[in-house]
A protein has these predicted regions:
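A cross-family kinase active-site recognition segment
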Residues: 122, 126-180
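A glycine-centered beta->alpha junction motif in the catalytic cores
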Residues: 60, 108-121, 171-173, 290-309
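ATP/Mg2+ or Mg2+-diphosphate-binding catalytic cores
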Residues: 5, 295-332
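Active-site acidic catalytic loop and adjacent metal/ATP-binding pocket
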Residues: 39-47, 54-55, 91, 194-242
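An alpha-helical support segment within catalytic cores of ATP-dependent transferases
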Residues: 16-24, 147-150, 164-212
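Active-site activation/catalytic loop segments of kinase-like enzymes and analogous catalytic loops
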Residues: 241-275, 290-306
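ATP-binding pocket architecture of kinase catalytic cores
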Residues: 48-148
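Conserved NTP-binding catalytic cores of kinases and kinase-like/nucleotidyltransferase enzymes
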Residues: 1-88, 92-93, 331-332
């Protein structure tokens, strides 16, 4: 397990990166405010004589988990999206590099600071979610315009039904051995939903370059419009519907109810740029669940912090409604 850095170490890293930034980008940092969001990577809002920016340091241990070539490609694509009018922050470059390395081998990026507000899961209004759908459609269109070579195979490889059922049986046994009766119902729910899965339909889903982390913490909104799509670090070649399912569940599910009019508004925005067949949102949500459920539902889920707890709730909701999603959303 990679541990977060202590405040003293973080302060030392900032002092080093402050000097680097002022040298590379020829601005003077007047104030720096830590941003306490994200896992392990350090972030600060910089107020400078050239405007406001965000400094992001890549944790050395976490960086080892990245495919480094894909990460650089993702940052370069973020820059291309920005240059083509998509709402995502511009990166400051030095000698055409989007990522920079300090004397002590700290990797970092500097982005323009985008104005806007975070909105809680399921709390978007129809104008906001329409704007988001439109921006994601434009993003998917640009990422797959031929500038990038098509990936060899999607990142997500759906396991067989038998493998997944065995997984849930193992988790069920683990919860029983730990005496966690309160978690058993969540695991049994996943088992029951898995019985309904048709794996073949997932393979028919369109493949392409996608963001892979489209949840509310990575969106900013201003005046009923999306002002920023953030954090392209996980961008990869995958099933396009996974992006759609992730955004819809994050933005339209609230208090155990999926707001159908919000889902419709998102899809209307998306179709402003790209076609998505009527009813395919059902498969998008089902496939999202098949990919993510094992990440969030397990014997130790009672120790989740707030975001994983929300994701676990989403997975439980999809599992509970897996068989009725078709009836609920087939006309969208």
């Amino acid at each position: 397990m990679v541990e977060p850095l202590c405040n003293k170490k973080a302060a030392m890293i900032f002092q080093e990166l402050k000097v680097e930034c002022e040298t590379l980008f020829e601005f003077k940092i007047r104030n720096a405010i830590p941003i306490h969001r994200g896992w392990l990577n350090l972030k600060w809002k910089l107020e400078t004589d050239a405007g406001s920016f965000v400094l992001k340091q890549y944790n050395k241990e976490r960086y080892k988990m990245y495919n480094q070539e894909l990460l650089i490609q993702a940052l370069q694509q973020q820059q291309r999206l920005h240059n083509n009018g998509i709402s995502c922050p511009k990166l400051l470059t030095y000698k055409n590099n989007v990522m920079h390395i300090s004397k002590n081998n700290e990797r970092f990026i500097v982005l323009e600071h985008k104005e806007g507000n975070l909105i809680s899961p399921g709390k978007l209004n129809e104008k906001e979610i329409y704007s988001l759908g439109k921006a994601i459609g434009q993003m998917h269109d640009l990422l797959n315009d031929g500038s990038l070579i098509e990936g060899e195979k999607p990142k997500f490889v759906p396991p067989t039904k038998e493998n997944r059922l065995k997984h849930w049986e193992d988790k069920r046994r683990e919860a029983e051995q730990l005496g966690k009766e309160h978690i058993l119902s969540h695991i049994i729910l996943q088992q029951e939903a898995t019985q309904l899965v048709n794996i073949d339909q997932f393979y028919n889903s369109k493949k392409g370059w996608v963001h892979r982390d489209l949840w509310v913490d990575n969106f900013l909104f201003h005046n009923d419009e999306v002002s920023a799509i953030l954090d392209f670090d996980r961008m990869d070649y995958d099933y396009v519907e996974l992006d759609i399912g992730r955004a819809v569940i994050s933005c339209a599910l609230h208090d155990g109810v999926l707001n159908k009019s919000l889902v419709a508004s998102f899809l209307a925005g998306y179709r402003n740029k790209l076609d998505i067949p009527v009813g395919s949102i059902v498969r998008a949500i089902q496939m999202l669940w098949y990919m993510e459920s094992t990440w969030w539902i397990h014997a130790n889920m009672d120790q989740h912090s707030v975001p994983p707890s929300r994701f676990a709730d989403e997975m439980s909701w999809i599992a509970k409604n897996y068989g009725v999603l078709q009836k609920m959303l087939a006309d969208l």
